[in-house]
Amino acid sequence: MTKTQKLVLTSLIVFLTFLFSACSHVAVPRGPIPVKMDVVGPMNVNKAISLENGVPDSKLTLIASQGYHKWYADYNVWSSFIVSQLESELRGRGVQITPNSQEAFRVKVEQTGLFWGSFSTRCIVNVRVERKDGTWSKTYEGNNASPASLNRSVDGAVYKAVVAILQDKDFMNAILR
């Protein structure tokens, strides 16, 4: 082997090693999908509530891998996103949202996964909502597949989790207690 061939082969091996070992992605919801009033109607709640992020630390968690690609999620960011969307949707339905209310709820993303099928990418997100005093809690699932992109499956899964929370009679009963 000549000196030039060794140099090209070594360079190619180093290049391919870096190419295939550094393919990490962070999955984040891009923006809220508004919940229409015909999906979840107005709510008759006469007291103020507060929602807070139940994930204290910001750290990346591996949620999927495919070949050399790895996808991570920061559950603190996802929980903050869902809290923000829930506050907006509840305000739009007549619920008073005030910080540090006695009626406080924690929202916590517990698990997220990305799954590839033949024609679509699926995102499943599990969100726990609990009263701050510990008297009530429930886990909700947002499950969405999109043939278009991974980002759309993430956005749809978060939307479906928010809709599941807003439509749940147990959540309404926990607010009205």
In which residue ranges do the predicted regions lie?
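Generic low-polarity alpha-helical segments
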Residues: 1, 50-52, 127, 134
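Sec-dependent bacterial lipoprotein signal peptides
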Residues: 1-23
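Generic marker of residues within folded, mature protein domains
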Residues: 6, 13, 39-41, 97-99, ...
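A structural "domain/chain start" motif
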Residues: 23-84, 172-177
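Surface-exposed short loop/turn segments
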Residues: 24-34, 83, 88, 92-149
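Short, Lys/Arg-enriched charge-dense amphipathic segments
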Residues: 54-56, 118-131, 159-167
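Short secondary-structure boundary motifs at beta->alpha junctions and helix caps
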Residues: 64-76, 132-176
